[in-house]
Amino acid sequence: MAMTRSLEVKGQLVAGGKEPLICAPLVGRDEAAVLRELEVIVAKRPDLLEWRVDFYSGISDVERVVELAKEIRRSSAGIPVIFTRRSTREGGEPIGLSEDEVLSMYRAVARSGAVDFLDYELSSQPEHFEQAVALARETDTKLIASFHDFGKTPPVDEIVAKLVAMEEAGADIAKVAVMPQGLEDVLTLLQATLEAQKKIRLPVISMSMGAYGSLSRLFGWVFGSSVSFAVGQQASAPGQVPIEDLRTVLEVLQRSLKGE
C-alpha cells in the first residue's frame, strides 16, 4: 500500500512513483561550483535536484541565472529540477532583490523550460503567491508551496493549517520544514504529516531539521512525506543525511514493512 502521494512532471510520475523520492540540493556559489557539484550528485542518482539559487552569486543577473539553469538541465541526466529561492526570513541567503525582481527571475527560468518545479513560500504576499501559481500553470511546471520555521516546531493543528492553506492557495505540492527542540517535536511533525493526508489531496513534503530531525528524513515517508532531502555534496539545511546512507536505511525499512 502506498504511504505517500506521487509527484508528476508533465503527466509522468517522477521515478515511476517510487517512495520516498530522494532530492539533493545544489548550493554552489558560482557556475563552476554548481556544475562540479552537479557532476558528483548526478553520479549518485537522486530522484530530484533542487537548485537553491539564493546561494548563487550571480543571482542579480537574470540572463546568467537562465543560462546556468539550462546547463543544469543539460547535465542532469534527465533528473527533474526544483528551482528555489529561499528568503532570509525562512532560512535562505541574502540576495538583495525585491520580490518583484525575484518573480521576474522565476518567470524567465520557468519560461526557458529548464526546470520542472518552482518552490515559492506561502509567507509571501498573496498577490505575489498568486503570480507564482499563474506562472506554474502557464509553463506547465508544478508549484511547491513551502513554509520553514528554523526556530521551533508549531503545534500539530498549526502545521496542518499551513498545509491546508497551501492547497487552498493553488499549490500543487505542500512542503513544511520545522526545527525541533526535542524528540517530542519530531513526533509532532510526523503526526501533522499523517493528519494532513486526511485534510488535503496534495502530495506533502515534510521534515524536522537538525540532529533530532534527521529521524524524520529517514522514515517520514511512512507517515506520508513524499520526498526526503539528502546531501549529495553539500547540505542546504541542518540534519540532511548523505544520499548513500539514506538509501541504505530506506531499503532496510521497506523490506521490514513488507515482512521480508
From Swiss-Prot:
Gene3D superfamilies: Aldolase class I (3.20.20.70). Transmembrane segments: none annotated. GO terms for molecular function: 3-dehydroquinate dehydratase activity. 3-dehydroquinate binds at residues 50-52, 86, 217, 236, 240. It catalyses: 3-dehydroquinate = 3-dehydroshikimate + H2O. PANTHER family: 3-DEHYDROQUINATE DEHYDRATASE. Involved in the third step of the chorismate pathway, which leads to the biosynthesis of aromatic amino acids. Catalyzes the cis-dehydration of 3-dehydroquinate (DHQ) and introduces the first double bond of the aromatic ring to yield 3-dehydroshikimate. Belongs to the type-I 3-dehydroquinase family. This is 3-dehydroquinate dehydratase. The gene is aroD.
